[in-house]
């Protein structure tokens, strides 16, 4: 007995008959051949068996032979949607079980740092142009967005209908931004641009106020980092002119300019007096910026390096969040880190152990002749195109790529534990996640499609 009601069963039979009729040749202009007579006989027999009037199929709607394939395609789409919903239900079930076992998430129980984003976005924001860099406010529920049109915007994640602040920061595209909150609770936002300039803005009273323009690079400024060094707030920048420069925001002076690579310096990260850089020459390098001296370097990438990040050492009391790349090591305390992670256009992420330089009392660090090279300890493969950005949080690394996916890697096993697809319709240029300060369960990504996508619990 059929599970379909009579009307749906009749419609299905008509669709079947129409589909078969659309696949056989039509009637001849003059008479019928033997083959056509046999086909007509088969069609009449099938119509009789299905209890469909073959003469009632001549209407425009009835004669549509594509109706059955369309219905089949809709079933496939429904099945795909069912699979997505089942996956979402499983994620919610896992979260519920975790709450039952461990209680609410808090910094004390470490649940926040082990958070993995869901595969469905919470919401998205249209930036109006390709998003080139994003940065979460270190303390407030705000996100700073930079676009290839040179605009810098700030959105409140609790009310994202309109930007809190927006300014045309540069005449050409912004390549990178960074944010820092000092002891006086002032938020400073640094930008780098294709117009050869770096700028520093103060975010206060829902305004982005320009306080400093840093000029000196002779080509595109690729990346920027802002941090506090002792009592001064400094900015480090790198450029296609092959140089890295360190600036004092208080007066706008360039404190140091040095050339760590032989080709375009694409990216950098800073900790204290040490800077790590990645370049079009496919190498990564450790330098002591106050002297400009190169201390060691690593080779292994096959194409230009897109991003490099320092993996800071964990304090002894945070052993629960430790893995082999950030375990507390007394020998590395003067450096502040033992490993870095880099991404490349070769589709891989690579984790490097940085060799310790020679530390001599009352002298600048010296290269160690016995260990001049980085030690490649892990290669993470999973992306199928350029890997644009990476962030490290707890025991996980988060990467985004031109293959339109965000992947979450377990640093204990170097395996993908979650792959998030279909967030953007174009390349994913940048991501950010809380790596320190407030442990919010929040990830943002920016794409070439002009969208900022937010994933939160």
Swiss-Prot record:
The UniProt record lists the keyword Signal: no
Q: Where in the cell is it found?
A: Cytoplasm, Cytoskeleton; Cytoplasm, Cytoskeleton, Spindle pole
Q: Give the UniProt keywords, A-Z.
A: Cell cycle, Cell division, Coiled coil, Cytoplasm, Cytoskeleton, Microtubule, Mitosis, Repeat, Transport, WD repeat
A GO BP entry = establishment of mitotic spindle orientation
Show the Pfam families listed in the entry.
WD40
InterPro entries per record: Dynein_regulator_LIS1, G-protein_beta_WD-40_rep, LIS1_N, WD40/YVTN_repeat-like_dom_sf, WD40_repeat_CS, WD40_repeat_dom_sf, WD40_rpt
Coiled-coil annotated residue ranges, if any? 73-106
One GO cellular-component annotation of the UniProt record comes to: spindle pole
Map the WD repeats onto residue numbers: 126-165, 169-211, 216-257, 260-299, 322-362, 382-419, 423-457
SMART domains the record matches: WD40
| Entry function | Positively regulates the activity of the minus-end directed microtubule motor protein dynein. Plays a central role in positioning the mitotic spindle at the bud neck during cell division. Targets cytoplasmic dynein to microtubule plus ends, thereby promoting dynein-mediated microtubule sliding along the bud cortex and consequently the movement of the mitotic spindle to the bud neck.
Known partners and oligomeric status: Self-associates. Interacts with NDL1 and dynein.
- Family statement: Belongs to the WD repeat LIS1/nudF family.
Q: What is this protein called?
A: Nuclear distribution protein PAC1
Give the classification, highest ranks: Eukaryota, Fungi, Dikarya, Ascomycota, Saccharomycotina
């Amino acid at each position: 007995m059929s599970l379909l009601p009579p009307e749906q069963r009749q419609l299905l039979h008509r669709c079947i008959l129409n589909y078969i009729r659309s696949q056989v040749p039509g009637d001849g202009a003059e008479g019928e051949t033997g083959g056509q007579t046999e086909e007509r006989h088969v069609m009449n027999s099938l119509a009789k068996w299905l209890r469909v009037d073959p003469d009632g199929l001549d209407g425009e709607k009835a004669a549509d032979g594509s109706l059955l394939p369309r219905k089949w395609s809709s079933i496939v789409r429904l099945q795909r949607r069912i699979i997505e919903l089942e996956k979402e239900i499983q994620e919610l079930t896992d979260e519920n079980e975790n709450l039952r076992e461990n209680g609410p998430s808090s910094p004390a129980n470490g649940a926040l740092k082990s958070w993995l984003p869901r595969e469905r976005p919470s919401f998205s924001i249209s930036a109006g142009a390709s998003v080139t860099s994003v940065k979460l406010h270190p303390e407030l529920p705000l996100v700073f967005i930079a676009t290839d049109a040179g605009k810098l915007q700030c959105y409140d994640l609790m009310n994202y209908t309109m930007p809190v602040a927006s300014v045309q920061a540069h005449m050409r595209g912004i390549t990178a931004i960074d944010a820092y909150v000092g002891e006086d609770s002032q938020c400073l936002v640094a930008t780098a641009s294709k117009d050869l300039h770096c700028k520093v803005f103060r975010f206060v009273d829902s305004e982005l106020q320009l306080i400093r323009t840093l000029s000196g690079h002779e080509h595109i400024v690729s990346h920027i980092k802002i941090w506090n060094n002792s009592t001064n707030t400094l900015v480090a920048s790198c450029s296609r002119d092959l140089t890295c420069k360190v600036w004092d925001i208080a007066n706008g002076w360039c404190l140091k300019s040095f050339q760590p690579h032989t080709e375009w310096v694409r990216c950098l990260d800073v900790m204290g007096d040490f800077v790590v850089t990645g370049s079009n020459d496919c190498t990564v390098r450790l330098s002591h910026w106050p002297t400009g001296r190169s201390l060691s370097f690593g080779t292994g990438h096959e194409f230009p390096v897109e991003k490099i990040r320092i993996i800071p050492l964990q304090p002894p009391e945070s052993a629960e969040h430790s893995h082999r790349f950030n375990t507390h090591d007394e020998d590395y305390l003067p450096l502040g880190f033992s490993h870095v992670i880099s991404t490349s256009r070769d589709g891989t992420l690579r984790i490097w152990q940085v060799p310790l330089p020679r530390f001599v009392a009352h002298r600048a660090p010296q290269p160690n002749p016995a260990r001049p090279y980085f030690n490649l300890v892990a290669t993470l493969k999973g992306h199928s195109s350029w890997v644009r950005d990476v962030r490290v949080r707890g025991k996980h690394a988060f990467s985004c790529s031109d293959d339109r996916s965000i992947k979450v890697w377990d640093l204990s096993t170097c395996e993908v534990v979650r792959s998030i697809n279909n967030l953007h319709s174009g390349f994913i240029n940048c991501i950010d996640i809380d790596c320190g300060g407030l442990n919010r369960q929040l990830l943002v990504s920016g794409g070439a499609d002009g969208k900022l996508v937010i994933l939160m619990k």
